[in-house]
């Protein structure tokens, strides 16, 4: 029988990117880039966001791809943010169809129609990508933001560096804990609305909420993490790079209240699972953790 620690380590491993998934992500990046280059002047593209920071969870959805535009596309920079997104949307609809392409606040999402089975497996394939138009301004990037109607500054390298530093300061367990909570956040049991939006907000909060160093126990770390997230989800969480709008701006008061309730319930459910293990009920503890997280949490 799996010990609780063994189960968590197996769970962590299941949420990590493997070689086949990375290969498919690269193929999808090249596919979308090669097509968009027939429609726009693309200087280069690169995989970014949580995928590049190794904090992306499973199933592999909404992988960010920056498409850095050439100077020939500078006319977009002086227009409302929605203009370039509308044009990206129209171009991608031509290739993938309107049912597979949707506009988002700062990107265009392309769904590849990949089936997700009952165990959250996708045959190592990427479910969807987010195509993000961007301009390189020298020391940072600017991307369109429809909420403000403007181009906003961002620096994915700063985000990546902060995640790396946090991971190292937490005995190299920080990213695993973040992926676990993101996996919980993606659970279909929450309905159409994820508790925390964007999922990057979980990562931003973790920069402060996971503090004091790794305590050596996944179950207690996760319980404490959920509890602290619940306590602080109403706070304003600025961009860690100090450039763009607050990461927490996507959530209004009602959504934050719902998130707080669900995060608190998760911390309570974690406490129940811990109590099962403390009383020697290992099978019940594993089942409780699986009920909390979803099918990627192992029972054996």
Swiss-Prot record:
Its EC number is 2.7.7.-, 2.7.7.85. One of its GO terms (biological process) is nucleotide metabolic process. Keywords: Antiviral defense, ATP-binding, Magnesium, Metal-binding, Nucleotide metabolism, Nucleotide-binding, Nucleotidyltransferase, Transferase. It catalyses: 3 ATP = 3',3',3'-c-tri-AMP + 3 diphosphate; GTP + 2 ATP = 3',3',3'-cAAG + 3 diphosphate; 2 ATP = 3',3'-c-di-AMP + 2 diphosphate. Coiled coil: none annotated. CDD domains: NT_2-5OAS_ClassI-CCAase. Crystallized with and without Mg-ATP. InterPro entries: CD-NTase, NT_2-5OAS_ClassI-CCAase, NT_sf. It comes from the Bacteria. Disulfide bonds: none annotated. Its cofactor is Mn(2+). Activated for cAAA synthesis by Cap7 (also called HORMA2) and by Cap7:Cap8 (HORMA2:HORMA3). Does not require dsDNA for activity. The CdnD:Cap7:Cap8 complex (also called CdnD:HORMA2:HORMA3) is deactivated by Cap6 (also called Trip13). Mg(2+) binds at residues 62, 64, 130. ATP binds at residues 50, 53, 56, 154-159, 182, 199, 245. Belongs to the CD-NTase family. D05 subfamily. Cyclic nucleotide synthase (second messenger synthase) of a CBASS antivirus system. CBASS (cyclic oligonucleotide-based antiphage signaling system) provides immunity against bacteriophage. The CD-NTase protein synthesizes cyclic nucleotides in response to infection; these serve as specific second messenger signals. The signals activate a diverse range of effectors, leading to bacterial cell death and thus abortive phage infection. A type III-C(AAA) CBASS system. The 2 domains are closer in the ATP-bound enzyme. Interacts individually with Cap7 and Cap8; forms CdnD:Cap7:Cap8 complexes with stoichiometries of 1:1:1 and 2:1:1. This is Cyclic AMP-AMP-AMP synthase. The gene is cdnD.
């Amino acid at each position: 029988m799996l010990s609780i620690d063994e189960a968590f380590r197996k769970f962590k491993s299941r949420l990590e990117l493997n070689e086949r998934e990375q290969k498919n992500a690269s193929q999808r990046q090249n596919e979308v880039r090669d097509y968009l280059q027939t429609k726009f002047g693309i200087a280069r593209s690169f995989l970014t966001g949580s995928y590049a920071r190794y904090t992306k969870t499973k199933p592999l959805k909404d992988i960010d791809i920056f498409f850095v535009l050439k100077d020939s596309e500078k006319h977009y920079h002086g227009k409302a943010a929605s203009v370039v997104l509308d044009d990206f949307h129209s171009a991608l609809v031509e290739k993938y169809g309107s049912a597979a392409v949707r506009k988002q606040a700062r990107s265009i999402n392309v769904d590849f129609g990949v089936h997700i089975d009952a165990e959250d497996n996708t045959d190592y394939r990427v479910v969807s990508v987010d195509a993000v138009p961007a301009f390189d301004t020298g020391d940072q990037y600017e991307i369109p933001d429809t909420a403000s109607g403007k181009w906003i500054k961002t620096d994915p390298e700063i985000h990546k560096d902060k995640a790396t530093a946090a991971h190292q300061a937490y005995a190299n367990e920080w990213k695993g804990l973040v992926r676990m909570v993101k996996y919980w956040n993606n659970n279909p049991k929450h309905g159409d609305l994820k508790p925390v939006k964007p999922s990057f907000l979980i990562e931003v909060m973790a920069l402060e909420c996971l503090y004091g160093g790794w305590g050596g126990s996944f179950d207690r770390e996760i319980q404490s993490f959920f509890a602290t997230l619940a306590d602080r989800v109403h706070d304003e969480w600025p961009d860690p790079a100090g450039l763009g709008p607050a990461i927490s701006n996507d959530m209004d008061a009602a959504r934050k209240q719902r998130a707080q309730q669900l995060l608190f319930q998760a911390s309570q459910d974690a406490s129940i699972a811990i109590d099962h293990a403390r009383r020697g009920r290992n099978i019940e503890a594993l089942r409780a953790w699986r009920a909390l997280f979803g099918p990627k949490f192992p029972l054996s």
